[in-house]
Amino acid sequence: MIGMRVPSGLASLRTRAVVAQALLALFLLATLLVMLAALYMAWRELRSGYTLYLFTPPIFALFIALTLLPAAIGLSLWVWRGHANLAADHLTGLKYGALKATLAPWIPLANLALPKAAMRELWNRSHGEEEWFGQQSVDAINSWWTSYVIGMVILTLLTAMVLIDRFSNLAFLTPPGTNLLALAFSSGLLAASAWFLIRIISRITTAQETVTTVGDTFA
């Protein structure tokens, strides 16, 4: 987006985009590895007719979390710069400032909706839309957020179920292979969400560097 934004803000956004995309690529690789491993283990359980890997989901969930955390931090730094650039361009009607958009994923319950809305505004305003189109639907963001939320919900429920089964008097009886197939499905969704997000970061970063706002055009 060409306007009153300082070049240093655009350069910083590009640098942060590269870092965030690299960390997301590692997360994508980790989730794909988990998916493949879970599918193999599920196949073995289905063949044997027995549950062979009862405690595998929590271990894999921890592995995913360890790769998700640095990716989330890298994304937060990029989100901060992206929204700060919008403010520096003196755009009116922004609902999400840099601080609010950056903290949204880290606030319980709020992180179920606010990150998507903040990213949607960042996408639309970076692509030159006026404020009344700031929250219009974006297919890429819908795909990213749907994949991420469903994947995380399944992974969280699966991990909680296994831990409760292990450390309490409650027992969850599932057929062999069921938990691992659910793990593979959730990991696949998380991998897809990382792929969508890498592309979103690229599109928004390029838009801020090249797209001129309506206000700039008639200034």
Write out the residue ranges for each language-model feature.
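Membrane-interface extramembranous regions at the lipid-water interface
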Residues: M1-T51, A71-W106, A110-I154, L158-P176, ...
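Interfacial helix-start motif at the membrane-water boundary
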Residues: L54-P70
